[in-house]
Amino acid sequence: MYARIATFEGGDNEKLRQMNEERMQSGEMQPPEGMKRAMVLADPDSNRRLFIAFFDSREQIDAAQERFEQMGDEIPEDVRGRRTSVDVYEVAFENNV
């Protein structure tokens, strides 16, 4: 399992959450092929977010890059924020308690 972690600064957490829910329910926004799950971690004090997307392989992440770029174009920067970095990590282990 691999995780793609994109860091964003600025934007509007509430509008982003609302837009994501609406677009996913309507089918307007499709996640990248191969993405198993995703989560967004937000720090309201610094107005930063981490968007973490999980895939089975590094190759799937590489193949999804174009779709991630399209998703960035579909969401206005004043809502999504400015992407400051993208990193990929192998998931060493996971515990569900």
What is the role of each PLM region?
Residues M1-L50, D56-Q70, E77-V97:
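Short S/T/G/P-rich N-terminal loop/turn motif that feeds into the first structured element of a domain
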